[in-house]
């Protein structure tokens, strides 16, 4: 899977979980800026990403993710390992 595939999967998953298709899920998007974002949606999003990409994210990794770019960097590192 290349960077474009990761980005497409993450963007599609974000659209499905957050139900905000008008939002641009770019690398600089801060999660808290997504309309309706709350802790329940955050958990649902993380679980959906884990399932879609067959990875596991630990609590420290999730706590240090603030943007879509942070998530992309983490996903690439996980998949490369």
Where are these regions (language model features)?
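Thiotemplate assembly-line natural product biosynthesis machinery
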Residues: 1-23, 77-81
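Alpha-helical structural signal
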Residues: 14, 42-43, 68
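Phosphopantetheinylated carrier protein domains
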Residues: 42-64
